[in-house]
Structures are given as structure tokens and as C-alpha cells.
Swiss-Prot record:
Together with the chaperonin GroEL, plays an essential role in assisting protein folding. The GroEL-GroES system forms a nano-cage that allows encapsulation of the non-native substrate proteins and provides a physical environment optimized to promote and accelerate protein folding. GroES binds to the apical surface of the GroEL ring, thereby capping the opening of the GroEL channel. Heptamer of 7 subunits arranged in a ring. Interacts with the chaperonin GroEL. It is found in: Cytoplasm. This is Co-chaperonin GroES. NCBIfam families: PRK00364.1-4 (NF001528).
Length: 95
């Protein structure tokens, strides 16, 4: 299993389904600026402030989150597609 460092979180994105009508992809279909994901691993240390104080992670393994589609490092680990993101790129915890 990947062990993220610092303020990083490992997530598994939900499969994106293309919108279709009668089997055809709709014209103008664009990617959303956010994506749903499940938290797979969280850094044990969390983020450090400018004064050196440790801020523990706000999310836990298994939570469903909404991620801003920006600085995402997608990796394949043990035949599984995962992504490493900064906790700051998580904009909401779902459910």
C-alpha cells in the first residue's frame, strides 16, 4: 500500500460515465472541475504550519470526498489506478 507523506492523501476516483443518448456521446460533453473519490490512505503526520505546529489530517480512510481536479498525480500501484493529492485539494467530505 502507498503511504502518503506530509499533507498528501491517496484516493481512488470513481469511474466517470460518459453521458449518452441512444449510445452516442453527447456533443459538448466536458469534464467536471471536481471528481468524487474514496480515501485509500492518509499521511500519519499531517501538515506542518509555518511555525512547525502539526495539523492532523481532516479525512480518514474510507470516506467519500469531492476533489478539485487540479494537481493530481495519478499512479498505478499493484494493478490499481490511484491518485495522490494534497489534502487542500479536497473541497468536501460527502455523506
Amino acid at each position: 500500500m502507498l503511504k502518503p507523506l506530509g499533507d498528501r492523501v491517496v484516493v481512488r476516483f470513481e469511474e466517470e460515465k460518459e453521458q449518452t443518448v441512444g449510445g452516442f456521446v453527447l456533443a459538448g460533453n466536458h469534464k467536471e472541475s471536481t471528481r468524487k473519490a474514496t480515501v485509500v490512505a492518509v499521511s500519519e503526520t499531517g501538515m506542518r504550519t509555518i511555525t512547525g505546529e502539526v495539523v492532523p489530517p481532516s479525512v480518514t480512510v474510507g470516506q467519500m470526498v469531492l476533489v478539485e481536479d487540479g494537481q493530481v498525480l495519478e499512479v498505478t500501484h499493484e494493478d490499481e489506478k490511484l491518485a495522490i493529492i494534497r489534502e487542500a485539494d479536497i473541497i468536501a467530505i460527502l455523506g
